[in-house]
């Protein structure tokens, strides 16, 4: 969006160096249609509790949130199970505006996921996941592990989709302390709507009850 129709965009599209690095693979693309709202999908990123109870991580991961003027992100660290035991994994995601999203996965096999999220209707979103990995990992002796990472990420999206396709947006949701900073996120996300005015004053989450 712009401040007025004649103005320049309010933010620039972020360049991802891996996307043009000859040492990284071409994109491997997967597509879905999600029958829910783009905001419900976005809130998934700050709902840290769901990683354990929906995706089966070994614990509820700790996230370090970042808030910018038009972008946001988080670094989530969690134990990940592998055939060689648990390893320290990282999931670092960032967004610019409501539609540009990318996630870097580390710990098992380096992976960059570029998510192209396009609202079709109020409760219909078309999603493309574009994956790239270092060629040395994707084609090396652990190529099977690299491919398994992509399969697992897509499996997790399928798990989330079961919820999103049945999820109603609740403007006055009852939030518990362990749910993640949903309140801060909603205040931040309001800046993307024409009829709503957001700002950078992100206040601490107050638990319900």
PLM features: residue spans?
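Short, small-residue-biased leader/transition segments that mark boundaries at the very start
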Residues: 1-5
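C-terminal catalytic domain of Rieske-type non-heme iron oxygenases
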Residues: 9-209
